[in-house]
Swiss-Prot record:
Pfam families: FtsJ. Belongs to the class I-like SAM-binding methyltransferase superfamily. RNA methyltransferase RlmE family. Its EC number is 2.1.1.166. Keywords: Cytoplasm, Methyltransferase, rRNA processing, S-adenosyl-L-methionine, Transferase. It is found in: Cytoplasm. S-adenosyl-L-methionine binds at G60, W62, D80, D96, D121. Specifically methylates the uridine in position 2552 of 23S rRNA at the 2'-O position of the ribose in the fully assembled 50S ribosomal subunit. GO terms for molecular function: rRNA (uridine-2'-O-)-methyltransferase activity. This is Ribosomal RNA large subunit methyltransferase E.
Length: 216
């Protein structure tokens, strides 16, 4: 019974959510589109012609926004453990990003080139138990950062969803070694009760740049 009440409450909140209604009106697949749009309005992260990887892409809200902004000369590779309906000119890699085979497929799609931007809205299925949820969430953050380190061009950018809790401070410390500037963003469209926020990382230093920083 308690579970049914919780589910009903979630459904009521979801359908009364102004961003859900706005997404339906504007043709976006997810309310999450507005999180990226808010960051874009503030930081001008995405530009025409860019090469971008979108992690945790399904159902496609961020990919819709990104594809429109990069235009026909850009390139977008999206990936998620869930299926995603196709978006024109978007390469989709379906599978569990924690598996090496999926990483290999993404790297194959990237090819010998580098990308300008990696964005990650990945999050685990939450149990409500911080001792379980935080390690899972931080593991996904670490994997996203690992990919960014492999594929970003020097000067490239990285946007990643994070959660405050155990492991965050160490992650934040490490990421600051790799980028010239790291800022926190909490879009208005994030739900009030959510502990999520985003780290906006500008100016990838490259592996050599990070190693040089480590020496000082």
């Amino acid at each position: 019974m308690a579970r049914s009440k919780t589910s009903l409450k979630w459904l009521q909140e979801h359908f009364n959510d102004p961003y859900v209604k706005k997404a339906q009106k504007d043709g976006y697949r997810s309310r999450a589109s507005y999180k990226l749009l808010e960051i874009q309005d503030k930081d001008k992260l995405i530009r025409p012609g860019m090469s971008v990887i979108d992690l945790g892409a399904a159902p496609g809200g961020w990919s819709q926004v990104t594809s429109r902004l990069i235009g026909g000369q850009g390139r977008l590779i999206a990936s998620d453990i869930l299926e995603m309906d196709s978006i024109p000119d978007v390469t989709f890699v379906h599978g569990d990003f924690t598996q090496d085979t999926v990483l290999a497929q993404i790297l194959e799609a990237v090819g010998n080139s580098q990308v300008d931007l990696v964005i990650s809205d990945m999050a685990p299925n939450m149990s409500g138990l911080p001792a379980v949820d935080m390690p899972r969430a931080m593991f996904l953050c670490e994997l996203a950062l690992d990919l960014a380190g492999r594929v970003l061009r020097p000067g490239g950018d990285f946007l990643v969803k994070v959660f405050q809790g155990e492991g965050f401070d160490e992650y934040h410390k490490n990421i600051r070694k790799l980028f010239d500037k790291v800022q926190t963003r909490k879009p208005d469209s994030s739900r009030d009760r959510s502990r999520e926020q985003y780290l906006l990382c500008r100016g990838f230093r490259g592996v050599e740049g990070a190693a040089s920083e480590e020496r000082f």
